[in-house]
Amino acid sequence: QLVTETVTFEDATLNTSGILTGEKLAEEVTGDTGTYKEYSGTFYTSGTASFQCYYSDQWGSPYTAGFTVSNNTNMETPGLGDQYSVYAKGGAKDSKKFAVGYYDSYNASQGKAGAVPTVTFSKKVNPLNIWISNSTYAFCWWTLGEGDMGGTIAPPEKVDAILSMRGYADGTLKKEVAFKLVDEEKGLVVDEWTNVDLTPLGWVDKIEFHFVCENVNAPAYFCIDDLTVATELNY
């Protein structure tokens, strides 16, 4: 018998900035820059799904990658300072909370698994669908051309920015579902929550979210909500 479950993020406890990161799970480590706090792993669990993140304050201020749960909906402010906002008035289907993903290829290459936005499952599931939108940071970067430091540059030429959702089972890549956050051919930047079919992934125990774009300066950010999966009862 198949049952479905949906991750809505509505039960997440957020801090005063309206986000949930791996900060409270971080432990002291000692590196070349001295002692700092760091965490890479699961920071939020809902049903069978566990979401991964990377957190560090090595450079004096909090740094996050992978997933962050958020309720930030500032659609006006460009730049990295607004990295936790979705370009929408709320989560999918008028909800309050959602997750922001940041694909940090550098820290992932350094063995920080949480730097790749990843969902692991406690048993095999068949993903059905997920809602996806751009973050405000990414949307403004593509449409306004605002630089990180507040300097205005011309909006970049629109090229495909693809969110590659890769399903794994027992460590083996099975299938991939691709969604265009920016569509070069249509000249469009996604500006609303969009329902994406994940059934081609089949039965998996992990989904990795990779950001793929030929413009290496493009913000590797995206937002997700309402991930629905099917699983077998007592599987």
Where are these regions (language model features)?
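N-terminal targeting leaders for non-cytosolic proteins
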Residues: L2-A113, S122
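Short catalytic/ligand-binding loop motif for oxyanion handling, primarily in non-cytosolic enzymes
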Residues: T16-G18, S135-C140, V216-A218
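Short, structured protein-protein interaction patches enriched in aromatics and acidic/basic residues
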Residues: T30-K37, P155-M165
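Secretory/extracellular carbohydrate-interaction modules
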Residues: N107, G114, L128-F139, L144
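Long, positively charged low-complexity segments
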Residues: T118-F121, E176-V177
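Extended extracellular/luminal ectodomain segments enriched in beta-structured repeat modules
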Residues: S122-N129, W203-V204
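Short coil-to-beta strand junction motifs in C2/discoidin
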Residues: W141-L163
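Terminal, low-complexity interaction segments
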Residues: E157-Y235
